[in-house]
Amino acid sequence: MASDFLPVHRALLSVSDKTGLVELARVLLAYNIELLSTGGTATIIREAGLPVQDVADLTGFPEMMDGRVKTLHPVVHGGLLGRAGIDDAVMAKHGIAPIDLLILNLYPFEQITAKKDCTLADAVDTIDIGGPAMLRSAAKNFARVAVATSPDQYPDLLAELQEHHGQLSAEKRFALAVAAFNHVAQYDAAISNYLSSVSDMHTTLPLRHEFPAQLNNTFVKMTELRYGENPHQTGAFYRDVHPQPGTLATFQQLQGKRLSYNNLVDADAAWECVRQFEAPACVIVKHANPCGVAVGMACSDAYEAAYATDPTSAFGGIIAFNRTLDAVTMKSILDRQFVEVFIAPYYDADALAYAAKKANVRVLRIPSSAAMKATNQYDFKRIGSGLLVQSADTMHIHSDVLRTVTTLAPTDKQRRDLMFAWRVVKYVKSNAIVYAKDNRTIGIGAGQMSRVYSARIAGIKAADAHLAVTGSVMASDAFFPFRDGIDAAAATGIKAVIQPGGSMRDNEVIAAADEHGIAMLFTGIRHFRH
């Protein structure tokens, strides 16, 4: 099969995305490939002074119904589906000539339906019929026909044509066929998701339910993983077809061993947390929980403070920065501790050179900027034979909407620390407690079945790290059901608390804070994380 190259004599071009169209047509013509085309695609090729035959002239049947019917014809599909050496006589009898290459991309259904003013009629008019049919015909017959669905594929396609003097290999045809079927599947899934979400078709703008009756999601494999959650499990990482800029799925691995399942779970937690901060920040994560978070004047300051929170847990952790990682900080980290993964938007050349001395350390770059703050719109979690779907927890609060519920109000400095702690606690597994002071974590209590134990653990962590809790603040991801959590915090020296509120015993909790001289803010927002 490796030597199965076939020449391209005729190509049919019909594209909604005209990017690179004229350049592509010129190269095809240079190899004496006859061009067929439709509608606007043919017009652009012709206006460039290049010869092209309209499909309507080929079929003898005009485009009709405002372009809804133009390629649904045996001459077109027979030209794509005809098998060399099997269907030759039938094709000759009916005057059907082979089509060896199909260049086609579909009507932009997802882009049109994403517009706020898209009506149901607009959506229906954007459903491509002839395009998917041609893609399926060409892809099914990959033994003879090649098909490209995106301008991104043109360079490789043309490179092979040029290298092999107008011929394409079986491997290339098969790979393009797989991509075409994937493209059609994604397209049909988008249509299904949209129509399944329409709850009232009679309004000017169709009312749509947030969760469609049938959910069809498409993901693309980025890489196979070293192993799954445990070494006896296999794993792979798939990304959205259109990943949000600045999210983990856009990473580039600059060095290091193959990533594992746990590496990526932890990396996502670290990256999403560090992206919340405007000033230089460092987040160290272990087992999907932050074990140290800090903001500083530079990466080095932020790392030193984050590491000091829990040096024991930081060993073998994932470390994320929201600024360019410099060589001095990289050297300081690697000379001090074992690191599984580094994440940063950029790295100094000297920092990468030093990291290269530790060849197994994984170094990920995620291009990011202030404009790249998008996150997942929905979260998914597999359960037995099912899938839980929820809107992502993207709720942010501003300090001016916080409600002081105690006699004592927090100072301006305490409010800044409370806002810092509140940003961090969102990324800690429930029940979650964060002690913080001076824009750094002092102690973190994560994943306990009772909130009071998380508070106690945060205090224990601070004591183990020889960090003074006195004067610190505390954040809780959910309300305190009893006063015991406040009592435990007061015993360690906490002076201000931020929590959602909403407990049946809020009055008891507030009274406890007043007894201990603690200022308390209610956010009205819970941040459970499981």
Swiss-Prot record:
Comment field on protein domains: The IMP cyclohydrolase activity resides in the N-terminal region.
Pfam families in the cross-refs: AICARFT_IMPCHas, MGS
EC number: 2.1.2.3, 3.5.4.10
Entry keywords, A to Z: Hydrolase, Multifunctional enzyme, Purine biosynthesis, Transferase
PROSITE patterns from the UniProt entry: MGS
PANTHER family in UniProt: BIFUNCTIONAL PURINE BIOSYNTHESIS PROTEIN ATIC (PTHR11692:SF0), BIFUNCTIONAL PURINE BIOSYNTHESIS PROTEIN PURH (PTHR11692)
Coiled-coil spans in chain: none
Sequence similarity: Belongs to the PurH family.
MGS-like domain segment(s): 1-149
UniProt name for this protein: Bifunctional purine biosynthesis protein PurH
CDD domains noted in UniProt: IMPCH
GO CC terms in record: cytosol
Any one GO molecular function term: phosphoribosylaminoimidazolecarboxamide formyltransferase activity
Signal peptide: none
InterPro entries with a match to the protein in the record: AICAR_Tfase_dup_dom_sf, Cytidine_deaminase-like, MGS-like_dom, MGS-like_dom_sf, PurH-like
Catalytic reaction equation(s): (6R)-10-formyltetrahydrofolate + 5-amino-1-(5-phospho-beta-D-ribosyl)imidazole-4-carboxamide = 5-formamido-1-(5-phospho-D-ribosyl)imidazole-4-carboxamide + (6S)-5,6,7,8-tetrahydrofolate; IMP + H2O = 5-formamido-1-(5-phospho-D-ribosyl)imidazole-4-carboxamide
Any one Gene Ontology BP term: 'de novo' IMP biosynthetic process
Organism: Xylella fastidiosa (strain M12)
Pathway: Purine metabolism; IMP biosynthesis via de novo pathway; 5-formamido-1-(5-phospho-D-ribosyl)imidazole-4-carboxamide from 5-amino-1-(5-phospho-D-ribosyl)imidazole-4-carboxamide (10-formyl THF route): step 1/1; Purine metabolism; IMP biosynthesis via de novo pathway; IMP from 5-formamido-1-(5-phospho-D-ribosyl)imidazole-4-carboxamide: step 1/1
